Amino acid sequence: MAKDVPPPDVNGKTVLLKPNILSPKKPEFAICTHPVVVGAAVKLFLELGAKKVLVGESPATANPTSAAKATGMYNQIIDNGGEWVEFSDQIVVECPEGKLVKSFEFASPFADADIIVSLSKLKTHQFMSYTGAMKN
């Protein structure tokens, strides 16, 4: 596939991976992005020359770091050379030309990244057939 779809140029850049951690459940429950997928993505982007690979999430129902550890994701990130970040610090991005919204609040790691990659979990939803990356 790499020959058909060339990888992005990440050389010397900071990459932020955004997996989906719904709750602190082990991989066999298939609730979160599989930790092996996250670890492989960290490894791949570093092999492609990324300066740094950050991985972060902000689950609504659990402490982010505890949830990442419970899913096995945290160890995969660290073991493959990545860095876990929490989305606790916020920044405000001003949009003075906006018609309805004049500013947006984002987790600061998004501003620290040159490239953002969504590693969403394919799953169903009570109001949708499937969510894909819609909620990530």
Please give the residue ranges for each predicted region.
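N-terminal and secondary-structure boundary signal
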Residues: 1-136
